[in-house]
């Protein structure tokens, strides 16, 4: 980000997040119990989950104190691109829990011996409390007349996305476009690649996180369309748009799961397993599910989702694993060095 934009962009990000400061490796030792009986947890999470956990953590702390005779607990947050966050934990960031936006990030921690292989069985819904989908945020009046994925390949269009090489948000964007291309072209992979390559050639900025992409589009006023998660698009339009932005729902889009897990090795070393498990379990509570819906995340609780149908309209989505294989297969084929994404990305972008 150029220096002349840095101050305003940071102010915007702080305002939109309105959350406790992100904590990096300097706070890695904070996720533990201490001799006074106080418990401290560190939740390492993806970029645009800031708003959820800013409001969820106080709800959980209040409930925890009720259940534990007023016992003290604090929860600290670390946010960034999902895969970067997973790598940080794999390389030593002492997270008690991880709350990511794709299963491969937690599977990485399984391979590192930090999380149990059956982590999806530890919580309901395969450990996915919320889902989202990929939508388009456009400027007032939709001047480029973007109505569906196909329109993103138009000439003279500038797109802003998170970088698919390092972020879950960006990967869902790529897979959403590819899934649309396969459906629109009767599973003709060659035609799909032509479409995706043209769409990627229109990308003006590949940001290093979903929130950074939002800042670039909304605050720096770069681009005609931002491709991002439904919750991020809605919060941006509602909180900072002042009528200047509109959300476009494609007819068919990719479903984003937000899996969670206890980092078993860390929790056991610190004696925080019980608190960490209670913390994640509370994501399925009615108050937490309602909170997620109000923040435009699609809750696992079907009754809560139905009650918010006006804000979270029904739409046709696909699970990327049903089309592209397991996350290991997806990462290897599409996002490894020299993979399909690299093959289709215009050099110099």
Predicted feature residues:
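N-terminal segment of the mature folded domain
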Residues: 31-167, 309-310, 316, 341, ...
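C-terminal motif of bacterial Sec signal peptides marking the signal peptidase cleavage site
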Residues: 17-18
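A bilobed periplasmic-binding-protein/Venus flytrap-type ligand-binding module shared by bacterial periplasmic
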Residues: 133-142, 257-274, 291-295
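Bacterial N-terminal signal peptides that target proteins for export
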Residues: 1-7
């Amino acid at each position: 980000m150029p220096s002349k934009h840095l101050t305003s962009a940071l102010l915007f990000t702080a305002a939109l997040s309105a959350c406790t400061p992100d904590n990096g490796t300097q706070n890695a030792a904070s996720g533990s119990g201490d001799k006074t009986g106080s418990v401290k947890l560190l939740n390492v999470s993806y970029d645009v989950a800031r708003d959820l956990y800013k409001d969820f953590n106080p709800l959980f702390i209040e409930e925890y104190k009720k259940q534990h005779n007023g016992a003290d607990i604090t929860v600290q947050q670390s946010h960034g691109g999902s895969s970067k966050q997973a790598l940080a934990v794999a390389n030593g960031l002492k997270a008690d829990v991880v709350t990511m936006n794709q299963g491969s990030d937690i599977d990485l921690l399984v391979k590192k011996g930090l999380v149990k292989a059956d982590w999806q069985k530890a919580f309901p819904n395969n450990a996915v409390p919320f889902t989202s989908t990929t939508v388009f945020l456009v400027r007032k009046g939709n001047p480029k007349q973007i109505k569906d994925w196909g329109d993103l390949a138009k000439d003279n269009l500038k797109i802003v996305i998170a970088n698919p090489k390092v972020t879950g948000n960006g990967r869902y964007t790529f897979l959403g476009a590819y899934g649309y291309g396969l459906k629109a072209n009767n599973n003709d992979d060659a035609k799909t690649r032509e479409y995706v390559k043209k769409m990627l050639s229109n990308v003006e900025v590949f940001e290093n996180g979903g929130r950074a992409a939002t800042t670039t589009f909304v605050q720096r006023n770069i681009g005609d369309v931002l491709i991002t998660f439904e919750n991020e698009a809605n919060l941006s339009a509602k909180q900072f748009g002042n009528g200047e932005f509109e959300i476009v729902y494609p007819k068919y889009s990719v479903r984003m799961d937000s899996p969670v897990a206890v980092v078993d090795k860390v929790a056991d070393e610190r004696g925080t397993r019980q608190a960490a498990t209670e913390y994640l379990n509370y994501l399925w509570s009615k108050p937490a599910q309602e909170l997620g819906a109000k923040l435009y995340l699609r809750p696992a609780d079907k009754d809560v989702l139905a009650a918010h149908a006006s804000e979270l309209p029904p739409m046709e989505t696909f699970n990327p694993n049903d089309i592209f294989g397991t996350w290991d297969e997806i990462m290897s084929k599409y996002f490894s060095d020299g993979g399909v994404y690299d093959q289709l990305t215009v050099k110099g972008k």
